[in-house]
Regions:
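Repeated loop/turn-to-beta-strand initiation elements of outer-membrane beta-barrel proteins
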Residues: 62-67, 96-101, 131-135, 167-172, ...
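Outer-membrane beta-barrel "beta-signal"
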Residues: 121-124, 224-235
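Solvent-exposed loop/turn segments connecting transmembrane beta-strands
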Residues: 42-49, 73-82, 110-116, 145-153, ...
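Start-of-domain marker
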Residues: 43-93, 98
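Bacterial Sec-dependent N-terminal signal peptides
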Residues: 1-47, 235
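Detector for outer-membrane/organellar transmembrane beta-barrel domains
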Residues: 136-177
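Residue-level signature of outer-membrane beta-barrel architecture
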Residues: 57, 91, 126-128, 163-165, ...
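Transmembrane beta-strands of outer-membrane beta-barrel pores
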Residues: 69-75, 103-109, 128-130, 141-145, ...
Length: 235
């Protein structure tokens, strides 16, 4: 009887310990999702939900193909306002540099009008590690072919910082990033995106990312701000 009670008490203790650990992990996730989400819903011209899925298929150890689809729900997360499909090829030059050539088809709701855009683009990316800090950047040149408008080039430069190899058993890797947009047609910067997010490394079948994004538009010296909650799944 004593042995049975000992085993029962031990099982209960283990279950409670695991439950407490689970609650702590869930609380961490909720903190990163809910608190910034509440803050982001205040004082923005719009709040949006973005969801992207990216599929990569290696051809060899240096070359891979990629397919991406991206859905964006705007108007305070009530209507689908944007969708793109992107297909491309990536080539790793060395441990530091890689290049991409892609074609993107974009559909965007602008008021009552659904617009369509063809967007071929190329980019060069760079990455480096300094201890626990991973630094990466990329420069992308897009050629935007839009309905009933003259085509033009746009440049997008992004810098990202990741820290650590993974915290908690969920292997959470925090990061911050900033992306600037330069419109060659208008010869000026007209958009900025600031990201703060988490990569989740504990899932082996795919790589999920959760992030919060503030997008700032610049038009005629006036600023507009959109708060965005985003999810990206990489397979």
């Amino acid at each position: 009887m004593k042995i049975t009670n000992f085993i029962f008490n031990w099982i209960v203790k283990e279950i409670m310990e695991q439950k407490i650990i689970s609650i702590k992990y869930n609380a961490q996730i909720l903190f990163f999702i809910i608190i910034p989400g509440i803050l982001f819903s205040q004082g923005f011209d719009d709040t949006q939900l973005w969801h992207a899925e990216k599929f990569e298929k290696p051809i060899n150890d240096k070359t891979s193909l990629a397919l991406e689809q991206d859905f964006r729900i705007g108007e305070n997360m009530t209507n689908l306002v944007y969708f793109h499909a992107d297909f491309g090829i990536k080539r790793i030059i060395n441990k530091t540099f890689s290049i991409n050539l892609n074609f993107r088809e974009v559909f965007e709701q602008k008021g009552p009008e659904l617009t369509r855009e063809h967007r071929p683009h190329g980019q060069i990316a760079w990455k480096r590690k300094l201890g626990l800090l991973a630094i990466s950047s990329r420069a992308r040149l897009e050629y935007r072919i839009r309905q009933d408008k003259d085509p033009f080039f746009r440049n997008r430069d992004m810098l990202s910082l990741k820290y650590g190899k993974g915290f908690t058993p969920l292997m959470l890797v925090p990061y911050v990033a900033n992306e600037i947009f330069y419109d060659f047609k208008k010869s000026k910067l007209n958009r900025n995106r600031f990201f703060i997010g988490l990569n989740i490394g504990s899932i082996k079948s795919f790589k999920p990312t959760i992030y919060f994004l503030i997008q700032t538009g610049i038009e005629n010296k006036e600023y507009s701000h959109i708060g965005i909650l985003g999810f990206k799944l990489k397979f």
